[in-house]
Amino acid sequence: MMKPVMLSVYGAENVCASCVNMPTAKDTYEWLEAALKRKYPNQPFEMQYIDIHEPPDNEHAKELAEKIRNDEYFYPLVLVEDKIVGEGNPKLKDVYEEMEKHGYTENR
C-alpha cells in the first residue's frame, strides 16, 4: 500500500481581500476533503488546515504562512505534499493531477 500523501490548506478565518465572493479557507478544506474521498475511495490521504496567523512549530509552515501574510500568495493555499497546487480559488483538476502523480487512481 502506498504512503498517504499530505494535503495542506493554508488560510485564515476571514476571506482574503482578493478573494471576495469565494469560499473561506475552511470551506475549501471541507469541500476538497469530500471531493477527494469521493474520487479516491479506499485510498487514504491526510489533510491539515494551517491557520496563517498561528502556524504550527514547523519552519516550512511558518515560512509559507509569512509569505501569505505578506501577500506573496493568496489563500487558501493548497499543497499536495510540499507542492503548491492552488491558491485563492484552487481548481480540483490541479489537485487531482498532483494526487495521481503520487499513485492515486480514480474510482471507476
Swiss-Prot record:
Disulfide bonds join 16-19. Gene3D superfamilies: Hypothetical protein sa0798. It comes from the Bacteria. It holds the Pfam family DUF1462. Keywords: Disulfide bond, Redox-active center. The keyword Hydrolase does not apply. This is Putative disulfide oxidoreductase YuzD. It comes from Bacillus subtilis (strain 168). The lineage of its organism: Bacteria, Bacillati, Bacillota, Bacilli, Bacillales. The gene is yuzD.
